[in-house]
Amino acid sequence: FTPSLSPSLIPEPTIKVFSTLFKNEFVGEKEFYLIPSPEIFMKEMIASGSGSIFQISSCFRNSEQLGDVHNPEFTMLEYYTMGFSDKDSISLTHEMIKETAISSPQWLKNDPLVITMEEAMKEYAGVDLIKAQDYGYLKSEAERLNLYVPDKENWEDTFNRIFLTYVEPSLPIDREVYLCDYPSQIECLAKNYPDRPYKKRWEM
């Protein structure tokens, strides 16, 4: 198992964390964080040659809503499979969910929807994500959608306003949805495409 306390964090500015202060009379004080996911340690292991790897671990995220969907402490399965494409990983995730589900709800019987962020922004918000590489266009689209954009707001925050208000609530709930190819402006531990302004990242 990788540590639950970390001196550094994954580059996910939208995730709020729990912090604590380590105190030692010989080495002084240092801030540590309860991990929001084991990603940073697991990717270090992969870089060191571990090969395919998985872990079931306790994770912690601050400022979460309390309920059936969100909780400040939760158990996460994180895995990385060497040689797998995004399509392979999505297929594996779907099969794992089917095999481990206690019941078989209708949404699990329906074929998953795999959609790129570019497609989702266009379909559910009418925003051209290629044109939105220009912040002026992105801001004007947010205003067209009647969203307030504060002065000096950055690209990621304006994008999230549109995504959280129009795209996420519009995604189908009768099947699994896999969002792929996140904008490269959103920092995360994922590779950039060489020919497109997106990162090789997907989320369910």
Can you say where each PLM-predicted feature lies in the sequence?
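Metal-assisted phosphate- and nucleotidyl-transfer catalytic regions
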Residues: 99-204
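Class II aminoacyl-tRNA synthetase-like tRNA-binding/catalytic domains
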Residues: 1-87, 98
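Short intrinsically disordered coil segments
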Residues: 71, 94-95, 194-196
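Short amphipathic C-terminal alpha-helix that caps PH/PH-like domains
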Residues: 90-100
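Cytochrome P450
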Residues: 81-88, 92, 107-116
